[in-house]
Structure formats: C-alpha cells, structure tokens
Swiss-Prot record:
<dbReference type="GO" id="GO:0046872">
    <property type="term" value="F:metal ion binding"/>
</dbReference>
<feature type="binding site">
    <location>
        <position position="166"/>
    </location>
    <ligand>
        <name>Zn(2+)</name>
    </ligand>
</feature>
<dbReference type="InterPro" id="IPR009080">
    <property type="entry name" value="tRNAsynth_Ia_anticodon-bd"/>
</dbReference>
<keyword id="KW-0963">Cytoplasm</keyword>
<dbReference type="GO" id="GO:0005829">
    <property type="term" value="C:cytosol"/>
</dbReference>
<dbReference type="GO" id="GO:0017101">
    <property type="term" value="C:aminoacyl-tRNA synthetase multienzyme complex"/>
</dbReference>
<comment type="function">
    <text>Is required not only for elongation of protein synthesis but also for the initiation of all mRNA translation through initiator tRNA(fMet) aminoacylation.</text>
</comment>
<keyword id="KW-0862">Zinc</keyword>
<feature type="binding site">
    <location>
        <position position="154"/>
    </location>
    <ligand>
        <name>Zn(2+)</name>
    </ligand>
</feature>
<dbReference type="InterPro" id="IPR033911">
    <property type="entry name" value="MetRS_core"/>
</dbReference>
<feature type="domain" description="tRNA-binding">
    <location>
        <begin position="583"/>
        <end position="683"/>
    </location>
</feature>
<comment type="similarity">
    <text>Belongs to the class-I aminoacyl-tRNA synthetase family. MetG type 1 subfamily.</text>
</comment>
<keyword id="KW-0820">tRNA-binding</keyword>
<feature type="short sequence motif" description="'KMSKS' region">
    <location>
        <begin position="335"/>
        <end position="339"/>
    </location>
</feature>
<keyword id="KW-0436">Ligase</keyword>
<feature type="binding site">
    <location>
        <position position="338"/>
    </location>
    <ligand>
        <name>ATP</name>
    </ligand>
</feature>
<keyword id="KW-0067">ATP-binding</keyword>
Length: 683
C-alpha cells in the first residue's frame, strides 16, 4: 500500500509546499542537519525542473527551555542567542546551495500572531481545556522546572529521562508532572511537586482520524510505521509552559505555548511571509487544495505525524500530504554524538578546509536510501568522491570538452539512438524515483550516464577517428557533448554549482540552468562559442584526508578525556540517596535466558524479547538496547532481570520486567560469571 502511495507522479496541477524541520537556534550547523536539508533542496529543484509549481520554506526554531538555559549560561538574552545562530544557519544553507524561498524565525511577529490565532481556533472548536496538574519546582532556584530544566526517571520504562521526553529509553513524549524522582538540571537539587493550572489539547479525540489519515499519507515507511504504533495510545497533550520566553498563551500572560505547538506553526508563518513578499495568497497552500510535504529527521516523526496533523485538523487547515523522514548520520561508524566527539561541523570541519559544498551534497544524497543511516568517515568520503565524481562524471566532462577545444571542432551531428536511449533512461529514473524519495537511485542514474559516455568516447577513439574520418569523429563528439548537456541538466539538483560550471563551459549563461526543463536533456545541442574548459573536480589527496582524520581523532580523544573526568567527579559525588537493605529487598532479581528477540516496528532503540525465567511460560520484556545488540545477538544470552516490575506498555508492546545493563559507551548487558539456571534468584 505504501509503495502505491509513493508512486504518485509529479508534476501535478496542485501547488506544492515543501518544508524542512526547523533547525534549533541553540548551536552551530553540523552534517547531521544537512541530512534533512540537502535532500529537501534536491527534491524542490527536481520538481521545478519538471515544471512543478513549488514553494520551499524553513526557519529557525527559537523557543524552548534549552535556549533559555544556554542563554543564561552565556549571560545574554534568549533573543540574542537565537539571532546569533539564526544568522549562522542562514549563511550555511546558502553556502551549501540550500535555497529557501523564505527562511524565517519562530520568534518573529508573524509566528506569534499565527500561533495565537490557531490556539484560539482550537479553543473555540472545543479542543482545549484547562486542568490542574502537578509540576516540578526547584525551591533552591525558586523557579518552575518545565521540560529540560528537570531530569528524572521515566514512569514507563524506568530509564533516565528529561522532563518532556524519554530520549534514552522508550522515546515517549512525557507530560509535565509525569517524570519520577525529578531533579533540577540547573542546581542538581531534588525538585518539589506543586500544583498549577495548564491547558491541554484533546489529542485523544483524534485517534480514529489519525489512523485513517496515516493510511493515506504519502510518507516514507519509517514515518508511517512509527506513527501507527503511537496512534494506538493517545493522551491529551499539555500545550502550555510556565516560562517567560516564547509565544504568550492567549489570555494568560504567565504562560507560554509549548515549543512543539509554535514551531510547526512556523511553517505557516514563513509561508505567509513568503506570500506577502511575492504578492501571493498563503491560504492557497494552507487552506486550499495543495500538496504540503514535510522533510524531517527521524527523531521528530511523532510530532509531525501525530501532534501536527491533529492540530491542523482541529483548527481547519490543510493537512500535510507527505512526510519524508530521513535516517540518521553516524561518524566513523559511531553514533553521532557531540559529547563524545563524533561530529562534523559544517563550517569549521568542512567549508573552512576548502572542500566544495557540492561534494558533501553528493555524498549525502548518493550514499544510501533516504530512510537508512549514513556513515561519514573521511576515507569513505574520499573513496566515493574520487571514484564517482572525479573518476567518472568529472573525467568524462573534462576529456570531452578538452578534446573538442584542443582540436577546434564545431560539434554537429545527429543523436545516436543508443545515446538518446541512455539519456531517456536517466530522465525516466528521475521522474519515477523523485516521487519515491529515492535520491540515491537518481544519483546512481547520473553516474551510469557518465559511465555510458566514458565507454562511448573510449570505444570510438576520437583521437584516431579525427584523422581517419573527420565527419564521423564530429558526430561522435556531438553525441558526447549531448551527454555532457544532459548531465548538466539532470545533476543540477544534486551538484548545482558544478552543474552551472558545466553549463557555462557549454557556452550557455550559467544563470539560465535553473530554468532548464528535464526534457531539455534530449534537445540536440546547438554548437556555440565556448570558453576554454576548466577542471571540474580534483582528486582528494591522501595527505588532506589524513589531516582531516587526525582532527577527528584528536577531538574524540579530548571528548573521552573530558567524559572520563566527569565520570570521576560523579563517582566522588553519588547522585542518588542511600537506600536500606529493605529497599533493595523489594526488587526481585532473577537470572533469565533470552529465547527470542525481534525489533519493534517504528523504533530504532527497542527490542521485544522473550525471556525464560523458569516460569510456566516465557516473559515478554521490552529493552532499549537495539542500537547495541541485534536480535540475533540477544538470543541465547543469559541476563539479569527485575522480575517484579509493574507491567507497562512501551510503544504499544507490553513489557513484564526489565533487563539490566550498564551504560558506558553504549549499553552492556549484565550477566552471571558461572552458568545458572533460568529463574535463579540474584542476591
């Protein structure tokens, strides 16, 4: 069913709006950000090349507790912090060829006004109600502790969690007051629990709607499958926070709207700002018959496939037509991590060292399918670029244009049926796979076309043919330059600056390439004055890659030293109060043996395990260790289980216990030194 939905064709007669998940204005841009924005930019460029009316908007996410905490640490205002990173992101995107029709800011007046309007509409339609809830409060700091101001224990899976999300364990969204054993993140003190009135959105009333909606959503399978699981157990959603920074809740100046309400509303506000500047009507996209497509990271599927469509439905806006969720990025086969040094900063680690943005665009787009994880290492980057862009694509363009220039040939002729067929195959691949969000297949088709060109050039040996049969040689070169023209057009969405260089070397105005249409790749090249060709790509040398690898290695070592120092401090100061032997005796620890294990659909972290505890039948226990252990590795392992933990549901799957693991550089299962029978008590 998903495959049928993804085969929907472009262009269509409806306007298309493409958005990207908003970068959080709390730190600099890294390549993990580009995993979303570069594919979205390629998608937009391709649609336009196919004649599709398309608008492309994004902006900085300016609200939420992390920004307030960071601003306090730097002794500046939240707006000053946001402005600093807003400018950085805007600059990085432009340098990398990600060109939005509008790049806005959720703290700007348009978003404040649109957010208040939508919240008021939800209230008017009966989807919002007040409720007194228990919230964390720090008596030491004398402040409320919303969201990431507080840390504690997840009530569902017992993992360490932050106030609004169990990001380490079961990945659930947590409502204010749900977290157990809350502690202030600012001073480390134990938090008090106080009662306060907040406002809730009736998300629980949208269950049937969401189930039906998700079945019609033109989304990547990872987005739909993940959201389907969550749609089965909806709870009403607290949409206010007691903060000073943010969009004020209508009629209650002491509260602000939760950041995950006003952030996606930014998509609408940015469209309004674009439309005003362009003399268009924003309602054609947000209240008319349009196709709205969100490009997001895999970590914010819940918000875009559950919260957001329910809000839009409740307020009477057009629903998203598609959600495109990317895989993550690993660095050196390690989980992307700032604290552990496995990170690549776009400006400091890439652009500042002279690497062309198009190389990174190509690597991200061509490495693997969009929903799968990318691994970035400097050696893999070097190998892929040198083999494909330098060795095939760039080599073909250079040898053809250099040969023609050196011989002073006027290229004229007719297109060889084999060449027109190869070009048409590449065109058809673009037209088919863009609707499937299969950007790698499109990149592969471009390299295949350049390989066809290299083979054609080499097999016809124009350096000999020019002496033996000049007319035949001219026709061969005409077909070669036709492929070069096709490559420039078809690769513009992937490597826009390099494609423009080719376009200029063909004698066209580089600025006109963006207005070329995909079928122009088959329009015969008309001979024209051409400038002297220049080298398109240069080989990435071992010395340069070794230099970049050294920078990465040193960063990882420094991060490890810092983490080890922090661990030592934590060991000197126990974080939890001492317990009595009676407290410990309340836990029933038993030896278990894993007899079956499988991944939970829609989750990257969770495994569903069947554990033999010496009982009549095995226990089903959910564990958050899928990033460290595969299901195959789990089967047969002896583990330690808390057997009397209250049953709970995690992503709709019942869990009857907890498998114990040590958390150091990834979870490590606890086991016994000598063989023990399943069910043996641990004392």
């Amino acid at each position: 069913m998903i495959e049928e939905k993804l085969m929907s064709e472009f262009p269509c007669d409806k306007p298309v709006l493409v958005t990207c998940g908003l970068p959080y204005a709390n730190g600099s841009a890294h390549i993990g950000h580009l995993r979303t924005y570069i594919p979205a930019d390629m998608f937009v460029r391709t649609l336009r090349m196919m004649g599709q009316e398309t608008v492309f908007v994004c902006g900085s996410d300016a609200h939420g507790t992390p920004i307030i905490v960071n601003a306090e640490e730097q002794k500046i205002s939240p707006r000053q912090l946001v402005d600093k990173y807003h400018v950085q992101f805007d600059s990085i995107f432009k340098k990398c060829g990600v060109i939005f029709d509008r790049y806005g800011n959720t703290d700007d007046p348009t978003n404040h006004a649109r957010t208040k309007s939508i919240v008021s509409e939800l209230q008017k339609n009966g989807y919002v109600y007040p409720k007194e809830i228990k919230v964390a409060y720090c008596p030491q700091c004398q402040r409320g502790l919303p969201d990431r101001y507080v840390e504690g224990v997840c009530p569902y899976c017992s993992s360490i969690a932050r106030g609004d999300e169990c990001d380490i364990g079961c990945q659930r969204h947590l409502e204010p007051g749900e977290i157990l054993d809350p502690k202030c993140k600012v001073c480390g003190s134990k938090a008090e629990v106080r009662t306060q009135e907040h406002f809730f959105f009736k998300l629980s009333e949208f269950g049937d709607f969401l189930q039906e909606y998700l079945n019609t959503l033109h989304a990547t399978p990872n987005a739909v499958n993940y959201a389907m699981e969550w749609a089965k157990e909806l709870k009403d959603w607290c949409i206010t926070r007691n903060l000073e920074w943010g969009v004020k809740y209508p009629g209650h100046e002491d509260l602000v709207v939760y950041v995950w309400v006003d952030a996606p509303i930014g998509y609408i506000a940015f469209t309004e700002e674009y439309a005003k500047a362009a003399g268009k009507n924003w309602e054609d996209l947000w209240k008319g018959d349009s196709r709205i497509i969100h490009f997001i990271g895999g970590d914010i599927i819940y918000h875009h496939c559950i919260f957001w469509p329910a809000m839009l439905k409740g307020a009477g806006y057009t629903l998203p037509w598609g959600v495109v969720a990317s895989g993550m990025i690993k660095v050196n086969d390690k989980k992307f991590s700032k604290s552990r040094g496995y990170i690549v900063w776009v400006e400091d680690d890439y652009l500042a060292h002279g690497f062309h943005p198009d190389l990174l665009r190509y690597y991200i787009l061509s490495y693997t399918s969009h929903t799968k994880d990318i691994n970035f290492s400097w050696t893999e980057f070097q190998t892929k670029i040198n083999k494909e862009l330098v060795g095939s694509y760039g080599n073909f363009v250079n040898r053809v244009l250099t040969f023609i220039d050196s011989k002073g040939i006027d290229v004229k002729g007719t297109i060889d049926p084999k060449i027109s067929s190869a070009i048409k195959t590449a065109i058809d691949m673009v037209k088919t796979e863009i609707g499937n969000y299969e950007f790698k297949k499109i990149c592969d088709s471009i390299i295949t076309l350049s390989d066809v060109g290299n083979t054609y050039f080499q097999s016809h040996e124009p350096w000999k043919l020019i002496k033996e049969n000049p007319a035949a040689c001219e026709n061969v070169l005409f077909n070669c330059i036709q492929i070069v023209k096709a490559l420039a057009i078809l690769s513009e969405p992937t490597v826009p600056e390099k494609a423009k260089e080719i376009w200029g070397m063909l004698g066209y105005d580089p600025a006109t390439l963006a207005s070329a249409r995909i079928d122009d790749a088959l329009v015969p090249y008309e001979n024209r004055p051409r400038p002297k060709p220049s080298i398109l790509f240069t080989k990435l040398e071992d010395k340069k890659i070794a230099e970049m690898t050294k920078i990465m290695d040193e960063r990882v070592k420094a991060a490890e030293a810092k983490l080890n120092g922090k661990k030592a401090e934590e060991e000197l100061e126990p974080q939890l109060p001492p317990i009595t032997i009676d407290d410990f005796a309340k836990m029933e620890l038993r030896v278990g043996k894993v007899i079956a294990s499988e991944k939970i659909k829609g989750s990257k972290k969770l495994l569903k395990n069947l554990i033999d505890l010496g009982e009549d039948k095995p226990r089903q226990i959910v564990s958050g260790i899928a990033e460290v252990y595969t299901p195959e590795e789990m089967v047969g392992k002896t583990v330690i289980v808390i057997a009397n933990l209250k049953p709970t549901k995690i992503m709709g799957v019942e869990s009857n216990g907890m498998i114990l693991a040590a958390d150091s550089n990834g979870a490590t299962l606890l086991t016994v030194e000598k063989p023990s029978e399943p069910g043996t008590k641990v004392r």
